Curated annotation (Swiss-Prot):
Originating species: Burkholderia multivorans (strain ATCC 17616 / 249)
The protein's name: Transcriptional repressor NrdR
An individual GO BP term: negative regulation of DNA-templated transcription
Pfam families linked to this entry: ATP-cone, Zn_ribbon_NrdR
Gene it is expressed from: nrdR
Record keywords, A-Z: ATP-binding, DNA-binding, Metal-binding, Nucleotide-binding, Repressor, Transcription, Transcription regulation, Zinc, Zinc-finger
Length: 159
């Protein structure tokens, strides 16, 4: 590795350690020419696919946007931040597993809805109402009826 101080190409690794979060390897290096020390980090580079929007434009995948949209749907719902992070990680894993260079925004929205469905039904309906652009109450009723058919009946809550 090239020295950042004198640009000499011969450096030695003095120490290597796994970072605190386990996501990188930290290496202390020493330049054989100027004897200065510096630190480098080695990380896995994950190439998530570009998102193709409805209008055909392309943008980089942005984890923060997915987290923000899920947080908005889950606002004031009893779901931990760790559960949201895990859901987003599953979405990223699914995208990486496809090996595709691009993903349509519609597909990304479906992945988010699938994760929300498992986390919180209210959040799922909230997200679906915006994502699918519900026009009237009957569309809400259809989604709720879909849930009723899919899940066993629960006893009514006492107030």
């Amino acid at each position: 590795m090239r020295c950042p101080f004198c640009r000499h190409e011969d450096t030695q690794v003095v120490d290597s350690r796994v970072s605190e979060d386990g996501a990188a390897i930290r290496r202390r290096r020493r330049c054989s020419a100027c004897d200065k020390r510096f630190t480098t980090y080695e990380r896995v580079e994950l190439n998530l696919p570009a998102v193709v929007k409805k209008d055909g434009s392309r943008t980089e995948f942005d984890r923060r946007k997915i987290v923000a949209s899920m947080q908005l749907a889950l606002r004031k719902r009893p779901v931990a931040a760790d559960a949201i992070d895990a859901a987003v990680a599953r979405i990223e894993y699914q995208l990486l597993a496809t090996g595709e260079r691009e993903v349509r925004s519609e597909k990304l929205g479906e992945l988010v809805m699938n994760e929300l469905r498992g986390l919180d039904t209210i959040a799922y309906v909230r997200f679906a109402s915006v994502y699918r652009r519900f026009e009237d109450v009957s569309e809400f009723a259809d989604v709720i009826e879909e849930f009723r058919r899919a899940s066993p009946a629960k006893p009514p809550r006492k107030r």
